A protein has these predicted regions:
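Active-site pocket-lining/capping segments in soluble small-molecule metabolic enzymes
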Residues: 6-19, 23-26, 111, 135
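Short glycine/threonine-rich loop-to-helix capping motif typified by GTGT followed
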Residues: 9-16, 46-60, 87-98, 159-162
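Acidic, glycine-rich loop-and-beta core segments that form the ion-binding/anion-interacting portion
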Residues: 14-79
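Charged (often Lys/Glu-rich) extended helix/loop segments that serve as interaction or gating elements
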Residues: 75-207
Length: 207
């Protein structure tokens, strides 16, 4: 069953169950039994406030299917919840190469680009951007277009992003990059693959 993505209202999944039950009944009336039902993904994550609900409502999600989905004996249900599981687990960490002050727009040019996280360039998706260095300095806020170093006009992570006053060498975190980040990265313009750190790696280094 193909369903849309980024759903946070669980009522939509109840409606999906109703529709699947109708389709199931159509098959039953013709003595056709499906081995499994794949309900896809769809469970959304919050790109705008990644710290408010870092873990999706899995318990309520599975409970809903368990209650409302009318399965045949032995029939399996498959879920594809990749984004909901890993999106909030990863951030793209980048360093500011230059700050360019324009007449109307200030730019923060970082060393990461569309080659590392293509979602903003590909379909203008939003990712929260944080200036970790500026937060530590408690600097005043300003607006920046945050762009990468790839020679493409689409190499932009965000326009008019409100950030602490930014300077060369500042460290940025581009949030919710755990899904569709590294897996969609490329070597375009001879860009090398960036190193990926996991919490397990850090724990090993401390041991």
């Amino acid at each position: 069953v193909l369903f849309r993505s980024q759903i946070t209202d669980l009522t939509s999944f109840r409606n999906l169950c109703t529709r699947i039950n109708e389709i199931q009944q159509w098959f039953r009336s013709r003595n056709i039994s499906l081995e499994h039902i794949n309900v896809g993904g769809g469970l959304g994550v919050d790109y705008y406030a990644p710290d408010e609900k870092p873990i999706a409502e899995f318990a309520a999600y599975f409970s809903l299917f368990n209650e409302f989905l009318d399965l045949n004996p032995g029939q399996q249900v498959h879920f594809e919840l990749g984004r909901a599981i890993v999106a909030q687990c990863g951030s793209l960490i980048s360093k500011v190469l230059y700050v360019k002050n324009g007449l109307n727009t200030d730019f923060a040019i970082v060393d990461a680009g569309m080659t590392e996280l293509i979602r903003p360039a590909l379909y203008q998706s939003y990712h929260k951007i944080e200036n970790l260095s500026g937060q530590l300095r408690n600097d005043k806020l300003a607006y920046y277009d945050v762009v990468g170093p790839v020679c493409e006009s689409s190499d932009c992570f965000g326009k008019r992003v409100e950030l602490p006053s930014t300077q060369r060498g500042d460290v940025f975190a581009i949030r919710t990059a755990g899904a569709y980040g590294e897996v969609m990265a490329s070597n375009y313009n001879l860009r090398g693959k960036v190193r990926c750190f996991t919490s397990a790696d850090l724990l090993k280094e401390k041991a």
